[in-house]
Amino acid sequence: MNFKAERINIALAGGIIGIISVALVLMGNPANMGFCLACFIRDTAGGLGLHRAEAVQYIRPEIIGLILGAMGLSMARGEFSPRGGSSPVTRFFLGFFVMIGCLMFLGCPFRMVLRLAGGDLNDVVGLVGFVAGIIVGVFFLKRGYSLRRTYKQGQGEGIILPLAQIALLILVVAAPAFIFFTAEGPGAKHAAIIISLAGGLIVGALAQYTRLCMVGGFRDMILFREPKLLIGFCMIFVTALIGNLALGKFNLGFVEQPVAHNDALWNFLGMLLAGFGCCLLGGCPLRQMVMAGEGNTDSAITYLGLLVGAAFCHNFGLAASGKGPTPNGKVAVIIGLIVLFIIAAVNTFSKKESAGTERS
């Protein structure tokens, strides 16, 4: 694929994903939440009973479809390649703290774009924080930060998470008594299962084909002046904006925004944490889910970190709400930033010391 065609494909994929995101809201998803990896993983954690926040309990078919769509296309293209072993424990905790940052802001990088397309100006502060977090991450990348190489693994390792998603799909369709469903709140707002699943499958396939990644877009722009990946997310914004304007769902302002708060400092710090953590991971939650579908077990571990992080956020009062951040959540974000700085510094500068010792 030549360079120009690659950019065109990314733009087309972004445009389609933006349209799907608006369509899912029209079909029942919460406003400005046609797609949100953090929110949907949080809802799934609630649906499984990992937390008991009654307003956000529903196994989201979009996540299931996203992973299965990425797996299906990667297999069709001969790109399904089980691999892992690259600092899995570190990745788990990075995913954990990324979720804390996202639930302080009330959205992942994907939803950040959709919130902006819906007129939520609080998102501008979040975007600045997100980019600042990536810049901090790039500082360490330039100095040698790395989570080591991955190793080839058996086919069985690569299909465990996709098989788990099929099990979740069976549960949400069968609706047994031990699975939780929100009666009122964001978790109760959703498109029909088949529509949500189809949306996820398409987004997963498109993201796998184009390597869409919000973090990768800004990172590559900062490091290499390469805007390719950003084109996709710009197109998501443009098509979602046009869709919201056409459907009368555009609401410009800071207040009375759906599933959002207007505390600028903590919107900034939440996305600073998310951007920093995603940069250290090597990709945003969307990219992590796609790589998990491709057989990457490190990304599957990151998914588990996100899932456990979501459960912790609601079990211990860390998640923000439309009323604003909680005291516990503020402490958790600060702790998360400290932990990430420690992980990045130890990883980066201990390598330099060991390299210097070897040379001497």
Regions found by a protein language model. Give the residues of each.
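Membrane-interfacial helix-loop segments of redox and metal-homeostasis proteins
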Residues: 1-360
